């Protein structure tokens, strides 16, 4: 496999193109912080690399941890690891390199970011194991992405405050809600495989209600973000 082919294969495996949808979570926290403390081009660059590294490490670990589950699921059996396109060893190395990119970026930003980077990785990796024992895995995924605004705020200010905490909570609720919708696709497989999810635990109809409630709460919390940050009606 050529170098370019390898890069493209790993990019498909972790859905690298979807990083563009994850970056706004971090940039929204950075924007809140910049309004109070200013921000440099270097900080934006390191925040971007940290976010890409964190997401790549999380996706790589998820594919590695779930490779046997993916092979048994018709929806995911065509992924690169179940198909043998990439090896578990190569994916493990990819996770290590991506984790190092996150840690190095955190080191370049400030000490608090560096100290918190192992905790971030622990939460990201923990999510991949959750479906084996709890239906609350959707909330853990929300926590994984909800940490991005707070992390970006810390990257800019070196401190913790309520606006990014509330913004992170809004992201948590929104992500958990759409992940419940997504999990409805695997309802029958999850039950047969003994995997845990809100649709598998409560049924699809109740799961959809729960997802809608979470999204409604996300909107409420977003309003609180604006109030806590002193933003005007345009926000």
Model-derived segments and their meaning:
Residues 31-49, 112-124, 138-193, 204-218, ...:
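Functional transmembrane core segments of multi-pass inner-membrane proteins
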Residues 3, 7-12, 49, 56, ...:
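Intramembrane alpha-helical segments
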Residues 14, 66, 137, 186:
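Residue-level signature of catalytic and energy-coupling elements of molecular machines
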């Amino acid at each position: 496999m050529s170098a370019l082919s390898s890069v493209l294969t790993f990019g498909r495996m972790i859905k690298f193109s979807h990083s563009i949808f994850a970056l706004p979570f971090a940039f929204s926290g950075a924007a809140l912080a910049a309004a109070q403390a200013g921000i440099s081009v270097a900080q934006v660059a390191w925040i971007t690399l940290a976010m890409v590294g964190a997401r790549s490490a999380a996706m790589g670990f998820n594919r590695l941890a779930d490779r046997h589950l993916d092979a048994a699921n018709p929806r995911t059996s065509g992924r690169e690891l179940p198909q043998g396109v990439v090896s578990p060893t190569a994916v493990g190395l990819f996770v290590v390199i991506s984790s190092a990119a996150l840690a190095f970026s955190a080191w370049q930003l400030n000490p608090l970011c560096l100290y918190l980077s192992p905790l971030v990785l622990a939460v990201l990796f923990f999510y991949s194991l959750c479906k084996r024992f709890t239906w609350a895995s959707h909330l853990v995924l929300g926590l994984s992405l909800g940490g991005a605004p707070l992390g970006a705020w810390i990257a800019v200010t070196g401190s913790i405050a309520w606006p990014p905490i509330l913004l992170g909570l809004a992201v948590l609720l929104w992500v958990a809600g759409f992940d419940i919708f997504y999990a409805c696709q695997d309802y029958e497989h999850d039950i047969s495989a003994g995997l845990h999810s809100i649709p598998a635990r409560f049924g699809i109809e109740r799961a959809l209600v729960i997802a809608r409630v979470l999204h409604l709460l996300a909107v409420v919390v977003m309003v609180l973000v604006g109030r806590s940050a002193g933003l005007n009606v345009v926000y």
